[in-house]
UniProtKB/Swiss-Prot annotation:
GO BP term, example: response to selenium ion
GO cellular component annotations of the record: cytosol; mitochondrion
Origin organism lineage: Eukaryota, Metazoa, Chordata, Craniata, Vertebrata
Cited Gene3D superfamilies: Glutaredoxin (3.40.30.10)
Classification via CDD domains: GSH_Peroxidase
Protein name as catalogued: Glutathione peroxidase 1
Complex formation: Homotetramer. Interacts with MIEN1.
N6-succinyllysine PTM sites in chain numbering: K91, K117, K151
Gene: GPX1
Leading EC class: oxidoreductase
Location relative to the cell: Cytoplasm; Mitochondrion
Site (Subject to oxidation and hydroselenide loss to dehydroalanine): U52
Enzyme Commission identifier(s): 1.11.1.9, 1.11.1.12
Modified residues (Phosphoserine): S37, S200, S204
Length: 206
């Protein structure tokens, strides 16, 4: 049974209210980073893969957003995942070299935060992604987006709010609350107006 099928009362009793309840270990190793340390920042969270057909497009656009908007308070977070077509089959220690020499290649280096490989769907999903999927069950640009090809579904249980492929995006406000989810087809760079709107808001007096 999907977590989404549990009673609303049970979920309300235990569910975190923001991403600040979660932590993740950086790709380079070391101690887990609490997302609470990013309080007040606008976050763009993506499940990434280094061998996907859109790796070049999305990684370079993630870099561009971080470069342009990072000084104003945007933090881009990438979470490698091998659940979609086995397109992140490298070990954690190999991913940066894959990005540098293969895709995007040409010496590419991500300027945003990358974390260790994790699962985003199923019983072993990283708690952050389980939370994001509950908070935003479908992409705002394509509410029908879901994985429909059985040969690519390698996780269990299968839920309606599952991430459908690499490079789905979650935009999180400066209070840590998820605001919008975008499908893999929505260009990363086209999220810029939504990010700009959040960065332009006056800080809450609460």
């Amino acid at each position: 049974m999907c977590a989404a099928q549990r009673s609303a009362a049970a979920l309300a009793a235990v569910a975190p209210r923001s991403v600040y309840a979660f932590s993740a270990r950086p790709l380079a190793g070391g101690e887990p980073i609490s997302l609470g340390s990013l309080r007040g920042k606008v976050l763009l969270i993506e499940n990434v893969a280094s061998l996907u057909g859109t790796t070049v497009r999305d990684y370079t656009q993630m870099n561009e957003l971080q470069r342009r908007l990072g000084p104003r308070g945007l933090v881009v977070l990438g979470f490698p995942c091998n659940q979609f077509g086995h397109q992140e089959n490298a070990k954690n220690g190999e991913i940066l070299n894959c990005l540098k020499y293969v895709r995007p290649g040409g010496g590419f280096e991500p300027n945003f935060m990358l974390f260790e490989k994790c699962e985003v769907n199923g019983a072993n999903a990283h708690p952050l992604f389980a939370f994001l999927r509950e908070a935003l069950p479908t992409p705002s640009d394509d509410a029908t987006a879901l994985m429909t090809d059985p040969k690519f579904i390698t996780w269990s249980p299968v839920c309606r709010n599952d991430i459908a492929w690499n490079f789905e995006k979650f935009l999180v406000g400066p209070d840590g609350v998820p605001l919008r989810r975008y499908s893999r087809r929505f260009l990363t760079i086209d999220i810029e107006p939504d990010i700009e709107a959040l960065l332009s808001q006056e800080p809450s007096s609460a």
